């Protein structure tokens, strides 16, 4: 997935799942399964349920995404 093709949306983490996966509810009400991006994993950025995050979605699979930013 090229970065230009990604769709960026905001959401709220609903649930933490095994293997650094999270269930995220987007602003439009949809729920997606998202994993942490490599840079966030490298710098040990913690994500907890209730955190507001920025998620990148692939145009090919809108049910899976990558968490790229945790908002303060």
UniProtKB/Swiss-Prot annotation:
InterPro entries (UniProt xref): NA-bd_OB-fold, RNA-binding_domain_S1_IF1, S1_domain, TIF_IF1
Keyword RNA-binding listed: yes
Keyword hit for RNA-binding: yes
Keywords: Cytoplasm, Initiation factor, Protein biosynthesis, RNA-binding, rRNA-binding
GO cellular component, one term: cytosol
Subcellular localization, as worded in the UniProt entry: Cytoplasm
Transmembrane intervals: none
Domain S1-like: 1-72
Pfam families: eIF-1a
GO molecular-function terms, A-Z: ribosome binding; rRNA binding; translation initiation factor activity
Family: Belongs to the IF-1 family.
Quaternary data: Component of the 30S ribosomal translation pre-initiation complex which assembles on the 30S ribosome in the order IF-2 and IF-3, IF-1 and N-formylmethionyl-tRNA(fMet); mRNA recruitment can occur at any time during PIC assembly.
Record HAMAP family: IF_1
Stated role: One of the essential components for the initiation of protein synthesis. Stabilizes the binding of IF-2 and IF-3 on the 30S subunit to which N-formylmethionyl-tRNA(fMet) subsequently binds. Helps modulate mRNA selection, yielding the 30S pre-initiation complex (PIC). Upon addition of the 50S ribosomal subunit IF-1, IF-2 and IF-3 are released leaving the mature 70S translation initiation complex.
Name of the protein: Translation initiation factor IF-1 1
Biological source species: Nitratidesulfovibrio vulgaris (strain ATCC 29579 / DSM 644 / CCUG 34227 / NCIMB 8303 / VKM B-1760 / Hildenborough) (Desulfovibrio vulgaris)
């Amino acid at each position: 997935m090229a970065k230009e093709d990604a769709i960026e949306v905001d959401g709220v983490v609903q649930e933490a799942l095994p293997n650094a996966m999270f269930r995220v509810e987007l602003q439009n009400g949809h729920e997606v399964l998202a994993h942490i991006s490599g840079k966030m994993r490298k710098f040990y950025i913690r994500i907890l349920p209730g955190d507001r995050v920025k998620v990148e979605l692939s145009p090919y699979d809108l049910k899976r995404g990558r968490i790229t930013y945790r908002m303060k």
